[in-house]
Amino acid sequence: MSTLFTNNIASQNGTSIAVQSGHAITGAAGSIVVPKQMIQYEHNFANNTGFSTTSSSMVDVTNFYVDITPKYTNSLLIFECTLDSKTTTAAAYARYRLVDSNNSDTVMHTNTYIGQSNYWAGTSEWLTTSLRTVFVSGTTSTMRLQLQMQLNSGGTFEMNWSGSDQRVLQVTEIAV
């Protein structure tokens, strides 16, 4: 067996390189990276119950986190989740953000928030909220991507829809 050391491989003729039938290019996990392809997927299950707050400053949403150890510092991470909630005051509304709780609650997105819910909704209306954000990982250390929220305009924010409802929080790492 021989070893070929090179920084670039180019086709002598045309724009593609053929691999003979029955042969394959192999490598250790992560050694072959195709831009815009998924590198890894991580998730966490959380019950949509047992969380309420009156806080007008950011607090952790209990069990709404997902852990990931990015393979590359420049890859994109896509975070997604849904939740059901209501407020006890019609004018109240929630704002959400995503932080890395393993890194001093560093905010992971470029704007202040990643979404809102319950704005001028009735006090007995349970609303489903979808949250999604994309950001550059910036590290290969383990991250705990924690959802946080704050309640504006008073009242109480509740996530007590059903103890039998399970939510998926997920993060996908994408090569650039």
Residue map of PLM features:
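Glycine-rich, low-complexity segments
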Residues: 3-51
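Extended, low-complexity regulatory regions
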Residues: 64-66
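Terminal beta-strand-rich extracellular "head" domains
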Residues: 45-60, 69-176
